[in-house]
Amino acid sequence: MIETRLLQPVTPADLVTVTRLHDDVEAVDGHPSLGEAVWRDLDQPLEPVSAGILAIDDGRPVGFAYVYRSDSFSPAHWAAGMVVHPEVRGSTGVEVALLERAVEHVAAAGGGLVVLWVFEPEQHDDEAAARAGFRHQRDLLQERVPLPLGEEPAWPPGVEVRPFVPGQDDRAWLSVNNRAFADHPEQGGWVEATLERRMAEPWFDPKGFLLAFDADGLAGFCWTKVHPATDADPELGEIFVIGVDPSRQGSGLGRALVVAGLSHLADRGIGTGMLFVDGDNEAALRLYASLGFTTHRRDRAYEREVAPA
């Protein structure tokens, strides 16, 4: 019989257990189950309401879910991730048990919107989410392209490009980012503390954070990130965030910034470029397809509004 345990806080010993389970599942699936934001909050929770739920079957950990709140979200909401061992997926009710326990925790903590992310969703994921009261919100596609591209950036007239300077460009970047992503649930609504936390990450490199200026100021940006090679993937160069001020859209600046970011990554010797894009963003998908990107992975978000207990 499946037993669920609430882990609040998640202790170092708990984290060892979760990491071992996640690594075992990733070795079978060929992709992670928990995203970077989950691991970041597991390591350093931003709020004490973060909690893990561990599923135990006959004394063996077979599943784990994590719920947390973060100021990276606009409007503010809960996020959740889940990993379940392939041996018990879909048939034992582990997913539903984890989600129902997570919902109970959110309700006890005041309720709110919960967004669950599942990587490479299958039918049993859709069914489990629906049984736990979640509905499909959106799909996010991971796109990849071989590097180098063989294309140079074609900058609009009067545009100059240089790397981001921490402490100097923060406010200008936040202003353009929040205009460019005004309606985006993760990238919009950033504040200085959000940016500072990203710059404190070990992967942050201002040389790969390109800013494009015109006569009126900051017009757009391309922020890149390097992922070390893993057993499942080669070293990847990610377009972490690409944004153009709404007043400059349609000028060709977006394509030039993508090409410039990928060129920077190729110059570092990285052979594969990567980015994430919403599955219904047809304009962006056409742009990326024209540059040679193809879909490598699909991530799915499910949402549920939870009333306070």
Each predicted region: which residue ranges?
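Short amphipathic alpha-helix that is part of the acyltransferase structural core
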Residues: 1-40, 154-188
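Hydrophobic residues on conserved beta-strands that form the core of alpha/beta folds
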Residues: 4, 77-79, 161, 239
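Conserved donor-binding loop and adjoining core beta-sheet/short helix segment
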Residues: 22-109, 115-119, 219-234
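Conserved catalytic-core motifs of GNAT/GCN5-like acyltransferases
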Residues: 72, 117-120, 135-148, 274-277, ...
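Active-site acidic-Proline motif in GNAT/NAT acetyltransferases
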Residues: 85-88, 245-247, 251, 279-280
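Conserved active-site alpha-helix within GNAT-family acetyltransferase domains
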Residues: 96-100, 104, 108, 120-138, ...
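Phosphate-binding active sites in nucleotide-utilizing proteins
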Residues: 181-227
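Hydrophobic multi-pass inner-membrane translocation pores used for secretion
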Residues: 240-243, 249-276, 287-289, 293, ...
